[in-house]
Amino acid sequence: MIKSKFIVIEGLEGAGKTHACICVQRILKENNIKNVILVRQPGSTPVAEKIRKLIKNNTYIEDFEKETELLLMYAARIQLVKKIIQPALKKGTWVISDRHDLSSLAYQGGGLGIKRKLINKLKYLFLQDFIPDLTIYLDVYPEIGLKRASKRNHLDRIEHRSLTFFKKTRASYLKNIKLDKKIIKINANLNIKIVTQNIKNQILKWLQQKVV
């Protein structure tokens, strides 16, 4: 039996992360891994969900400082990791997360311009060496992702940002995934059926490696 794992799905708005999380959970269960939970960042605990609303609400008359946004993201992340993710892993439950710390490097780092060194210091200060066992990065062009996101009923504060912001965020993603061999890049610009099959192929290949 494979030890419980922490799997993260990353990508821009409209990349299909929610669908991918459900897809990965289904694949795991089809391969006799029954104890699997889904979480999202920020969110998935009472405190973290309140922080999520604070971050995403676009009705505030006061703009967020970029450092404020980063710290709020990490406050929610720490709460989720300590309260839900780590306890679940210790009990043998697999965890699939919609976003993790790579999002902060991409959004607050690449998009908002906070230095990578500062973000990493914050990460190691509170989460030490806690890292995902596997990250799937769904790569989508910002123009395509935002068009998909715009079909939703309501765009949040971050989704309202400029195309330039998301281009910088994607560039940061592409730069950072080259530094981590545990990150798998999947083209999310394609038809959802093709993307789903590619996700399945990568997960099955990864599971085989873990069994061996």
Curated annotation (Swiss-Prot):
<dbReference type="InterPro" id="IPR039430">
    <property type="entry name" value="Thymidylate_kin-like_dom"/>
</dbReference>
<dbReference type="GO" id="GO:0005829">
    <property type="term" value="C:cytosol"/>
</dbReference>
<comment type="similarity">
    <text>Belongs to the thymidylate kinase family.</text>
</comment>
<protein>
    <recommendedName>
        <fullName>Thymidylate kinase</fullName>
        <ecNumber>2.7.4.9</ecNumber>
    </recommendedName>
</protein>
<dbReference type="GO" id="GO:0006235">
    <property type="term" value="P:dTTP biosynthetic process"/>
</dbReference>
<keyword id="KW-0545">Nucleotide biosynthesis</keyword>
<dbReference type="InterPro" id="IPR027417">
    <property type="entry name" value="P-loop_NTPase"/>
</dbReference>
<dbReference type="InterPro" id="IPR018095">
    <property type="entry name" value="Thymidylate_kin_CS"/>
</dbReference>
<dbReference type="InterPro" id="IPR018094">
    <property type="entry name" value="Thymidylate_kinase"/>
</dbReference>
<keyword id="KW-0808">Transferase</keyword>
<comment type="function">
    <text>Phosphorylation of dTMP to form dTDP in both de novo and salvage pathways of dTTP synthesis.</text>
</comment>
<dbReference type="GO" id="GO:0006233">
    <property type="term" value="P:dTDP biosynthetic process"/>
</dbReference>
<keyword id="KW-0418">Kinase</keyword>
<keyword id="KW-0067">ATP-binding</keyword>
<dbReference type="GO" id="GO:0004798">
    <property type="term" value="F:dTMP kinase activity"/>
</dbReference>
<keyword id="KW-0547">Nucleotide-binding</keyword>
<feature type="binding site">
    <location>
        <begin position="11"/>
        <end position="18"/>
    </location>
    <ligand>
        <name>ATP</name>
    </ligand>
</feature>
<dbReference type="GO" id="GO:0006227">
    <property type="term" value="P:dUDP biosynthetic process"/>
</dbReference>
<dbReference type="GO" id="GO:0005524">
    <property type="term" value="F:ATP binding"/>
</dbReference>
<dbReference type="Pfam" id="PF02223">
    <property type="entry name" value="Thymidylate_kin"/>
</dbReference>
